[in-house]
Amino acid sequence: MGLKSYLLGRNGEKRAEAFLIKNGFTIREKNFHSRFGEIDIIAQKDGILHFIEVKLSEKSDPVYMITQKKMEKLLLAIEFYMMKNGLELPYQIDGVLIKKNTLEMIENLTIM
């Protein structure tokens, strides 16, 4: 990943974080790394943990950037996070998708 891509990604995560806070989420952790992969944002609202994947694209629809393989890695990282922190809370996987100046949150992501 080049510097430009890295900076765009970090900017997208900051925008997503501001959006989440504005909408009543509490940010628990950002950029959680494990050997299974990274979780961009871990937030909580109404007793539910939200594991949030942030995708930013200037050209195509960012929803297509969340692949089956990415979801599988994310699920392993979530299991590790929950076990490491001794958590047994309900959770869901969400996406914050950013294309140019449009930000959209999709809750309960699944890939068939």
From Swiss-Prot:
InterPro entries: Restrct_endonuc-II-like (IPR011335), tRNA_endonuc-like_dom_sf (IPR011856), UPF0102_YraN-like (IPR003509). It holds the Pfam family UPF0102. It comes from the Bacteria. Signal peptide: none annotated. GO terms for molecular function: nucleic acid binding. PANTHER family: UPF0102 PROTEIN YRAN. NCBIfam families: PRK12497.2-4. Belongs to the UPF0102 family. This is UPF0102 protein NIS_1551. It comes from Nitratiruptor sp. (strain SB155-2).
